[in-house]
Amino acid sequence: MQTIKCVVVGDGAVGKTCLLISYTTNKFPSEYVPTVFDNYAVTVMIGGEPYTLGLFDTAGQEDYDRLRPLSYPQTDVFLVCFSVVAPASFENVREKWVPEISHHCSKTPFLLVGTQVDLRDDPGMLEKLAKNKQKPVSTDVGEKLAKELKAVKYVECSALTQKGLKNVFDEAILAALDPPQQEKKKKCNIL
């Protein structure tokens, strides 16, 4: 059975672990516990063939900047995550996450993933953002950044409601199996 390695990166507390747990178990975790490193595996059928989708969760916190890239070798696709209600996490996509994965894995495709979309219209969240003269990141703005950074695609989801959740992983699988404008199956190698 062929394995697809998918590594999830992004700032701490943007919902990377919730995304993975909600997708793999259909349950939303009740408390926040920062991740050091975790992995999950699910079997998916693609064109009648079974594949193992290996999902690698990483720590977003700066303390792990030197440790995190150790999970990058042989990656088939990255999910670069930010919270649509945390504008700083969106800025870090350009400032930190895409440069980091591009440095270690320049040929590996990635998707830009906007998380926590259920909070985009939440009155309490909108009020909190407004106090800081901020607003949620719109779909258009996410798509524009994805195009600028040459992501395969921009996708959004809510791990809480599962809206768009399956689509994130379907698109990741497609990107891994058919990387656009590149030779097939360029994997990340760290020398």
UniProtKB/Swiss-Prot annotation:
Superkingdom classification of source: Eukaryota
Binding site for GTP: 10-17, 57-61, 115-118
Cysteine methyl ester carried by residues: 188
Motif, Effector region: chain positions: 32-40
Listed result of changing residue 61 to L: May lock enzyme in its GTP-bound active state. Defect in distal tip cell (DTC) migration. Partially rescues the axon guidance defects of AIY interneurons in kpc-1 (gk8) and chin-1 (ns399) double mutants
Compartment list: Cell membrane; Recycling endosome; Cytoplasm
Residue numbers covered by the propeptide annotation in the UniProt entry: 189-191
Xref: InterPro entries: Cdc42 (IPR037874), P-loop_NTPase (IPR027417), Small_GTP-bd (IPR005225), Small_GTPase (IPR001806), Small_GTPase_Rho (IPR003578)
Cellular component, GO annotation: cell cortex; centrosome; cytoplasm; cytosol; membrane; perinuclear region of cytoplasm; plasma membrane; recycling endosome
Topology class, membrane: Lipid-anchor
UniProt xrefs under SUPFAM superfamilies: P-loop containing nucleoside triphosphate hydrolases
Annotated Pfam families: Ras
Keywords: Cell cycle, Cell division, Cell membrane, Cytoplasm, Endosome, GTP-binding, Lipoprotein, Membrane, Methylation, Nucleotide-binding, Prenylation
Family: Belongs to the small GTPase superfamily. Rho family. CDC42 subfamily.
Function: Plays an essential role in spindle orientation and organizing cellular and embryonic polarity by controlling the localization and activity of PAR (partitioning-defective) proteins. Required for maintaining the asymmetric cortical localization of the anterior complex proteins par-3 and par-6, the posterior cortical protein par-2, and pkc-3. Involved in hypodermal cell fusion, together with pak-1 and ced-10, leading to embryonic body elongation, which involves dramatic cytoskeletal reorganization.
Name of the protein in question: Cell division control protein 42 homolog
